[in-house]
C-alpha cells in the first residue's frame, strides 16, 4: 500500500512539475480593447511574446459585461496565458482579468492604468464626467498613453526578463512615435489665432486638455438645425467635434453656416485588419485625429 501511495505521489508531483514548466514556457498575453492591444503589440514587437485580443474588430466598449458574457466568446486562450493587460482601475466594464482567471488561476493581471511601483511619474492624469463618474478614455491623452506603455513594459519585463531589452527598445520607439504625433499637431497650430471648439462629447476631454484646446461642452441631443447659429455665437466657435455621428441635416446646417463637424476616434470600436483588431489601430487613429483637427483649425483660422 505504501508503495502504491509513493508511486501516486511521484506521478502527481511529476504532472504538476510538467504543467508548471509548460506554463512558464508560454508567453501568451491577452488584451480586450484597441488602445491596450496596440500598446502591448508595439512594445513586444519582434519578441517571442504572443499578444492576443479576445475580441475581434466588431465589439464595442459600450457592450460592457455583456460582451464577456456572450456565449460565443472563446476564452480558451486564457487557459495557458501568462497575463492579461487591462485598464480595470479606470474602466469599470473591463472584466478581462475576472473572466480569464476563471479559466486560469495562475494568470497575472497587468493594469496599464495603474502602476504598483510607487513611481509618481507613472501616475495617470484622470478626469471625471460631469455626473461624477470616472472618464475611462485615458488613452486619449498622449502623456497618459506613454505612461500606460511604461507600466505594461515594466511588468512584462518582470514576467519575461529574457525579453526586457527588446521591450525597452520598443518602448522608446513607441513613446517617440506618440510624441511626434502630438508635436506635429502643436507645430502646425502654433501660429493660429484660435483653438476653440464646441465639444459634443466628454470622451475627448483628455485629448483637448493635452492639446490645450479650449472647448465648451454642448449636449449633442440639444443641437438642432434651428439652434446651430445660436450655439456657434454663444461659444465663439464654428468647429463641432464629437466621437460619433449626428443627424445629417444638422451637419449640413453647420457647414451651411460656415462651420465644421468632425468625428474623432476614441477607439470605442476597434479598427480592423482582415477581420481582426488592427495592431497599429491606435497609432493610425491618433494620426488621423490630428490631421482632422489641423485641417479644421487652419481652415477656420483663414476665415
What are these regions (language model features)?
Residues 4-13:
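Sec-dependent N-terminal signal peptides
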Residues 17-303:
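Extracytoplasmic metal-acquisition and chelation regions
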